[in-house]
Amino acid sequence: MYKASSVRYEKMSYARCGDSGLMLPRVSLGLWHNFGDTADYGNMKELVFTAFDNGITHFDLANNYGPEPGSAERNFGKILREELGFYRDEILVSTKAGYEMWDGPYGNMGSRKYLLASLDQSLKRMGLDYVDIFYHHRPDPETPL
């Protein structure tokens, strides 16, 4: 079982994120192509552990990250459950949606249906009850903000 460094917050600086109350590290770890099913799972764990041991508390994902869309969330969720669960309150998990995930008129872009369904699916893949930040991945010219 992973045990985090006791000095993990000594070198990293953090900045307030708007009015949210969240403090984001100056460096976050994006998990796009390095957490898909084609990557080595042992390397994924070491990358997350090294980041967290150095004060990186924000892990950025998306519903389509892989390769194989969704696999980055699934792999990160497994690491979180099996190794980092004790530290969940110290970790910021963000995910996003906006790119194609399934067939039909609600499989991408920015409809309310797509975004809510994507968030629900992301939570299931990661085995989480919530994410700390949910982004819209790209503008949708057909859906007004």
Q: Where does each model-flagged region fall?
A:
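N-terminal binding-site loop/beta-alpha segment at the start of enzyme catalytic domains
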Residues: 1-91
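Conserved beta-strand positions
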Residues: 29, 61, 95, 133-136
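Feature marks short, surface-exposed loop/turn motifs that line or immediately flank catalytic pockets
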Residues: 33-35, 65, 99-101, 137-140
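Generic beta-strand or strand-like secondary-structure segments
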Residues: 75-79, 92, 96, 114-121
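Structural motif corresponding to the early beta-alpha repeats
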Residues: 86-110
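Glycine/proline-rich, positively charged
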Residues: 102-145
